[in-house]
């Protein structure tokens, strides 16, 4: 009877240790996933900021082109 308690205790201890390792591995994987996602978010944020600058430049150029066209139309009407 004493031996079966020792074996049972060893099985329980081994299970607890294996479960702890599994949890640490999962935690490490999740931590790495979060870091990867944060890096991707930072990159996307930088991309969005660059695109915003390009959009503003395109709007400014379109406004200048429209102004030139308006000036040409006015000169033909005279």
Curated annotation (Swiss-Prot):
Record's signal peptide: 1-20
Primary site of residence: membrane
Alphabetized Gene3D superfamilies for the sequence: 1.20.5.190
Sequence repeat residue intervals: 24-34, 38-48
Coiled-coil blocks: 27-75
Modified residues annotated as N6-murein peptidoglycan lysine in this record: 78
Source domain of life: Bacteria
GO molecular function: lipid binding; peptidoglycan binding
Chain residues carrying a lipid of type S-diacylglycerol cysteine: 21
Family annotation (InterPro entries): Lipoprotein_leucine-zipper_dom, MOM_Lpp
Membrane topology according to the record: Lipid-anchor; Peptidoglycan-anchor
Keywords from the named record: Cell outer membrane, Cell wall, Coiled coil, Lipoprotein, Membrane, Palmitate, Peptidoglycan-anchor, Repeat, Secreted, Signal
A GO BP annotation: lipid modification
Compartments in which it is found: Cell outer membrane; Secreted, Cell wall
Subunit structure: Homotrimer.
Name of the featured protein: Major outer membrane lipoprotein Lpp
């Amino acid at each position: 009877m004493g031996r079966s308690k020792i074996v049972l205790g060893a099985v329980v201890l081994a299970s607890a240790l294996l479960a702890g390792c599994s949890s640490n591995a999962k935690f490490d994987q999740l931590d790495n996933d979060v870091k990867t996602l944060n890096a991707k978010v930072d990159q996307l944020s930088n991309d969005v900021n660059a695109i915003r600058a390009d959009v503003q430049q395109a709007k400014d150029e379109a406004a200048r082109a429209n102004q030139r066209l308006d000036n040409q139309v006015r000169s033909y009407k005279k």
